[in-house]
């Protein structure tokens, strides 16, 4: 399950979302996009993602987690291939919006499926390992895109989209063959239950006042993460090329380092949350992100950019890892999908706002530095909200 989950995350976020930043400079030049239009394309993705956040629980109930994942990956593969054919800004916007729909279906269903297979003692670590697939996707695109661009010239970004779509299609087939909705489908028990039977499904329906209080606070934290990490992820390569004069190949190597460090993100912060508490895991992750944004926001030289990229990568998947574990701990595995969808709504709203706001600010100021500084302020707000969480039931 972990191996299959890595492959799903490699495709639905690592390639579908995080290759966009690498392809954006060449794509923008070919389609003559302003910074604002670049931001709107990124926002379109998250509008699609946001739509799927609302529909994912119903879709999973109707089709099951495995079928939802396969459907999502299929949509991603098709729309990424169409992006490679796009000749205008509106068509690129529509295609990438539907890529977001597919990403939402696959990501949310995969995260909920993990909670079905792993007991609380291993849930944070297992989720972290699965999310490491995002980092593999970043490394893959960080090396593939510059090489394809060098070999194919100005239109290399189109071939890159096609190749990435093919990789997602292969992942779609493999996920359909390997994944199962729960351990009982294979006559197994929940991993980490130490020989005990999987706990029976909770009989609770809906959420209590205490549950809603927790969900609101987690939602605010997830919103700050959504706004900030996507600004950095969307525009850092553009910043390196346009503001620091790096070549596409050099910027690609920078981006690949994000992927490398992010391989440790989920496992490290998942372990911290399993060992100490979910609260400590969230606060530590937000603190690392704050440092990364400040280093990018001030002109401190190339060494500071390297450190910023390393810190960003190290904390890249930390918040989703701990969030899912927290939700599953507090609400139970059978309400985890609904709870995760609710807080992911906050996350998706943040991702809708982030690229648009940063793109418009860059058009006004000619730089993304103010966006990185504002991102640091928002993650500090997230730390303050994290401090209000109780340590009840591992949080």
Task: Report residues per predicted region.
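Helix-breaking motifs and short loop linkers at transmembrane-helix boundaries and internal kinks
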Residues: 32, 64, 85-90, 245, ...
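Helix-loop-helix hairpin linking two adjacent transmembrane segments in secondary transporters
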Residues: 129-181
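Helix-to-loop junctions at the C-terminal end of transmembrane segments
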Residues: 52-64, 266-277, 363
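Cytoplasmic helix-loop-helix junction between adjacent transmembrane helices
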Residues: 96-132
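C-terminal ends and interior cores of transmembrane alpha-helices
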Residues: 74-87, 288-300
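C-terminal membrane-cytosol helix-exit motif in multi-pass small-molecule transporters
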Residues: 165-194, 385-389
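C-terminal transmembrane helical hairpin of 12-TM major facilitator-type secondary transporters
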Residues: 262, 273-326
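Extracytoplasmic gate region of multi-pass secondary transporters
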Residues: 20-21, 211-263
């Amino acid at each position: 399950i972990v191996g299959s989950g890595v492959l799903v995350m490699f495709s639905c976020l690592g390639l579908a979302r995080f290759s966009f930043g690498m392809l954006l400079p060449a794509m923008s030049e070919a389609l003559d996009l302003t910074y604002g239009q670049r931001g709107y394309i990124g926002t379109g993705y998250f509008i699609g993602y946001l739509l799927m956040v609302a529909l994912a629980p119903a879709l999973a109930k109707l089709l099951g987690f495995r079928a939802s994942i396969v459907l999502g990956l299929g949509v991603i593969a098709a729309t990424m291939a169409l992006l490679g054919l796009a000749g205008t800004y509106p068509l690129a916007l529509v295609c990438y919006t539907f890529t977001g729909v597919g990403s939402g279906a696959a990501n949310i269903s995969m995260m909920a499926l993990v909670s079905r297979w792993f007991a609380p003692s291993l849930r944070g670590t297992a989720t972290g390992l699965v999310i490491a697939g995002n980092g593999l996707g970043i490394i893959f695109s960080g090396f593939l895109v510059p090489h394809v661009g060098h070999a194919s010239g100005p239109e290399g970004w189109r071939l890159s989209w096609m190749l990435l779509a093919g990789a997602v299609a292969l992942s779609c087939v493999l996920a359909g063959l390997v994944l199962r909705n729960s351990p009982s489908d294979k006559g197994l028990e929940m991993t980490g239950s130490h020989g005990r039977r999987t706990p029976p499904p909770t009989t609770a329906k809906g959420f209590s006042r205490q549950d809603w209080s927790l969900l609101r606070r987690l939602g605010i934290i997830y919103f700050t993460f959504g706004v900030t990490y996507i600004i950095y992820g969307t525009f850092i390569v553009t910043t390196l090329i346009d503001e620091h004069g790096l070549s596409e190949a050099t910027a690609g190597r920078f981006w690949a380092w994000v992927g490398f460090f992010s391989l440790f993100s989920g496992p490290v912060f998942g372990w911290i949350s399993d060992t100490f508490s979910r609260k400590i895991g969230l606060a530590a992750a937000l603190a690392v992100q704050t440092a990364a944004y400040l280093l990018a926001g001030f002109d401190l030289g190339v060494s500071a950019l390297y450190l910023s990229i390393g810190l960003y990568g190290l904390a890249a998947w930390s918040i989703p890892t701990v969030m899912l574990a927290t939700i599953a701990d507090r609400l139970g595995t059978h309400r985890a999908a609904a709870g995760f969808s609710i807080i992911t709504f906050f996350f998706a709203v943040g991702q809708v706002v982030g690229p648009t706001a940063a793109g418009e600010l860059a058009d006004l100021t000619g730089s993304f530095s103010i966006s990185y500084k504002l991102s640091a302020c928002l993650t500090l707000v997230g730390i303050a909200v994290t401090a209000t969480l109780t340590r009840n039931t591992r949080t």
